[in-house]
Amino acid sequence: MDDETKKLKNKNKETKEGDDVVAAESSFSSVNLHIDPTLITMNDVRQLSTQQNAALNRDLFLTLKGKHPNLPDKDKDFRIAMMLYRLAVKSSSLQSDDDATGITYTREGVEVDLSDKLWTDVVFNSKGIGNRTNALRVWGRTNDALYLAFCRQNRNLSYGGRPLDAGIPAGYHYLCADFLTGAGLTDLECAVYIQAKEQLLKKRGADDVVVTNVRQLGKFNTR
């Protein structure tokens, strides 16, 4: 992991400017971790094909590079992971009332202004995904392994109020993302994730409701 401090500013009402984060290396190794498949049940299993996802991620990176021409190609995974991080903060739920507009971060001395509209427009207009219901979630689910690998190396990123509402402990706030498939979670991450769902329901007086789909969690976006 790089020792260089990364400056991150979330452009929304709740987030303080100047959050410092530590950036991960731009390459991510594959993650092969045990999970009990009976612990998390998902009804929403839509994902892109490998070819569709590669094409979309290439378009996302090229769009960002069009705004910042000096970005090295080797950083593509890192740049896509930052977009996935933004998706986790915003929530992919169609019920989300998030009003965030993007972030500004610095990597290797280069400041990048990552507008949410820049990457969401690319996803919505993609031929392989744009015509699907909630295209952002389909893209997020397809890339959740990249998201998890990135977040495990950057555990101090800010996700707003949702992780606190859910009682997610420090260092695991990335589990508030509502596009996770459940695959690749460690046993501890799985336990935290399930506990968070139960906590959100209890805080809203819905003890008799069972969450069987991460789509139900996105609406819990603010305190």
Curated annotation (Swiss-Prot):
Coiled coil: none annotated. It is found in: Virion. The keyword Transcription regulation does not apply. GO terms for cellular component: helical viral capsid. It comes from the Viruses. Pfam families: Closter_coat. Residues 1-19 have a biased composition (Basic and acidic residues). Residues 1-21 are annotated as: Disordered. Keywords: Capsid protein, Helical capsid protein, Virion. Consists of at least two size variants, CP1 and CP2, which result of post-translational proteolysis at sites approximately 12 to 15 and 26 AA from the N-terminus respectively. Belongs to the closteroviridae capsid protein family. This is Capsid protein. It comes from Citrus tristeza virus (isolate T36) (CTV).
